[in-house]
């Protein structure tokens, strides 16, 4: 069974955590939830100064046992910490250190730190 169907409380927690992040920052914009078949996706943008990064977060079938994955929505290389040209961003939270209580909002914050940090270099 799909995680967000079998654990609607966790689905609500994810939506609320991301809504709180969006409301509390000015850099998280254009948040949009959608389904691709039965896959839950989140489109969003990180905006900092003159930079705008369009991203998509994929919630895996086995979430929250494994973390969501964050990709560039445009299929281009954004970071030296990215697997391939259109691959996922290598963030602080990975399958080897992921904890069940962590959220997609934390993944978005990690993507923000990575992209803003690299753009400042």
Per-segment meaning from a language model:
Residues 1, 5, 87-88, 103-104, ...:
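Type-3 copper protein
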Residues 1-31:
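Generic start-of-chain signal for non-secretory N-termini
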Residues 13-14, 107, 111:
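Alpha-helical structural motif
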Residues 22, 27-109:
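Compact alpha/beta protein-protein interaction domains typified by the UBC
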């Amino acid at each position: 069974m799909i995680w967000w169907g079998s654990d609607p409380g966790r689905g609500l927690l994810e939506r609320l955590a991301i809504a709180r992040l969006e409301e509390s920052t000015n850099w998280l914009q254009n948040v949009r939830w959608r389904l691709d078949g039965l896959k839950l996706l989140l489109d969003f943008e990180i905006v900092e100064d003159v930079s705008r990064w369009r991203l998509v977060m994929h919630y895996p079938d086995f979430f929250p046992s494994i973390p969501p994955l964050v990709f560039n929505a445009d299929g281009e290389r954004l970071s030296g910490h990215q697997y391939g040209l259109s691959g996922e961003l290598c963030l602080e939270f990975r399958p080897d250190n992921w904890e069940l209580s962590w959220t997609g909002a934390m993944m978005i914050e990690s993507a923000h730190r990575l992209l803003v940090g690299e753009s400042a270099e």
